Amino acid sequence: MKNQWFLLSLLATFLSFISCSKDDPFPTDEEDDMSFVHSVTVGDNAYVSLFKDLNVEQTSTQNSLVFAKESFLFTYGGNIYVLESMNARLYKYRVENGLLIQEKETMILPSGSLPAFLTFDSEEKAYISCVGLGKLYIINPTTMQKTGEIDLSEYAIGKESGDKNPEPGASVIRDGILYVGLAQDKSQFNPNTGAYVLLIDTKTDKPIKMISDNRATMATAYEYSGDPFIDEKGDLYIYCVGGFGYFANCTEGFLRIKKGETDFDQSYYFPIETISIPDIKGNKANYIYSKTYTGNGKLYGYFNVPGYVSNPRS
C-alpha cells in the first residue's frame, strides 16, 4: 500500500518502573536537572514523578505524586498538567528544585464528566474533552478557570434514538482549526462504524463541520494515546482503534488529512492488522494502544498481539 512510511516497533517496555523500599538502590538526580515527567499506573493509583534523562534505568514511587488511575499528563509553557479523569479534576504544576509544586487551585469538573484530553491553543486558552458530557470545556490554563463550553450533542449520530453524546476524545490544533475525534459509541467500547472528526474554529469556538470515513472506526480512543499528530509536512494523522478488536465490522487503521485540506485523504489508509510483524507470535497485531510519533516517518507504539492472549487471562 502506498505511503506506508511508518516504522512499526513493538516495545516491550519504554521505561522500567519499579516500586522500591527506602533502602533500595535509586538514582539520585541533581535537583535542577529534571527533564522528564512520567506517570505509571499501579493498581488503583497513578504515580507521577520526574527523572533526569533516558539513561536512568529505573525510577521509584518514593517521591511521586499519587493520583487516581486513569490520570493523564500534559505539558505546556514549562508547566505540567495532570488530568484526573475518574475524579474529574485538573491539576497544574511547575518544576522547582527537582520537585513538582502545585500552582493555582485544583480545577474541579462536574462528576461523571470524564475529562480525558487537554489541548492548548495559547497561554489563555485550552480545550478539555469531557467524554461523559459530550462537551468541550474551554479553560484559561494560566488562571485555571473555565471560560466557556461547546455542546457537541448536535453531532451525535445516535441523537434520533436519544443518544446525544458523541464521546469527544483526543484532539489537535492545526492552522486555527481544532480537530476532535468522536468515538460515537452505541454503548461503552461498542462504537458505531465509521470514523468521525469534528472541526472547530478556534477563533470563534464554533463548529465548522463533522467529517467521516467508513474505512475505519472510532477516531482516537477516548483519551490521550499519542494521536492525532501532525508530521513535518503538516499532514494530520488520526488512528482509529476499531472498537479495540472486539467487533469484526469495526476496522482499525490510520487516516490522514493532508495539509491545506479539511477532509480525509481518500488515497491513504493504513490498517495495522494487515502488516506482518516479525518476531511476535502469529506475526500479527490487531490494534495499537499508546503511540508516539518521533519524526522522520517513524512511530513507536504498544501493540495488541492476539497470539499472546490466553484464556483465562494470565
Locations of the language-model features?
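Bacterial Sec-dependent N-terminal signal peptides
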Residues: M1-V37
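Acidic/polar, low-complexity intrinsically disordered N-terminal segments immediately downstream
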Residues: K22-L109, P115-D121, K125-E149
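Entry beta-strands of beta-propeller and related beta-repeat scaffolds
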Residues: E31-V37, N79-I80, K125-A126, I177-V180, ...
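Short glycine/acidic-enriched loop and turn motifs that connect beta-strands
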Residues: T41-D44, N87-R89, G132-K135, D185-F189, ...
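Beta-propeller fold detector
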Residues: Q58-F67, I101-P110, K146-E160, P207-R215, ...
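Repeated scaffold domains used in trafficking and secretory/extracellular systems
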Residues: V66-G78, S111-D121, K159-A170, M218-P228, ...
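Beta-propeller blade signature
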Residues: N140, N192-D205, C250-T262, S314
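Loop/turn-rich, solvent-exposed surfaces of beta-rich toroidal or solenoidal domains
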Residues: K284-S314
